[in-house]
Amino acid sequence: MLLLIVFLMEVNLISVDKALKHAIKMVEEGADIIDLGGESTRPGHSYVDADEELRRVIPVIKKLKEELDTPISVDTYKAKVADESLKLGVEMINDVWGLTKDKDMASVIAKHNAYVCIMHNQDDTEYDKDIMESIKEFLTRKYKYSYKSWNR
């Protein structure tokens, strides 16, 4: 089971303490990983710069690391956010853009020897061929790209 805590609000409507209580509840219910993000990744979301995203996630990461033994994943496509999160002991980066939005993301993840969840995503919703074949090709390319980043 995966727990997703996303801080979508312009201001902190979800406090660190509320996030911790929610995470504890989800772990008690069987969550294996806490996945949190400082920017919504749903279609049409408002862009949040890396500094604001860090302002939102860093206090929560620190509190969760103090209170829980559950692995933490950070949902981000920004290398700066990934780097700072991994420095605090986050175990995995969940990149919904599959390492395509920030050219430094793969090297940051490799530097920390961290886990990564690479999702398929694209700006265009039109596919030249079968959707499953397109996704397979995308993920194969990203696997090869990641492998090269980790083996430099």
Predicted regions and their residues:
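N-terminal capping/lid subdomain adjacent to the active-site entrance of alpha/beta enzymes
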Residues: 1-22
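Alpha-helix-loop-beta-strand connector modules within alpha/beta enzyme cores
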Residues: 2, 46-76, 83, 110-117, ...
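Generic detector of well-ordered alpha-helical packing
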Residues: 2, 6, 36, 76, ...
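Conserved anion-binding
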Residues: 4-10, 40-44, 97-152
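Glycine-rich, proline-tolerant flexible connector loops at the mouths of alpha/beta enzymes
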Residues: 7, 32-59
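Flexible, glycine- and charge-enriched loops at secondary-structure boundaries
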Residues: 12-16, 50-54, 128, 132
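Alpha/beta enzyme core
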Residues: 15-36, 66-67, 71, 79-92, ...
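Aromatic/hydrophobic pocket-lining residues that form the small-molecule binding cavity
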Residues: 19, 23, 53-57, 61, ...
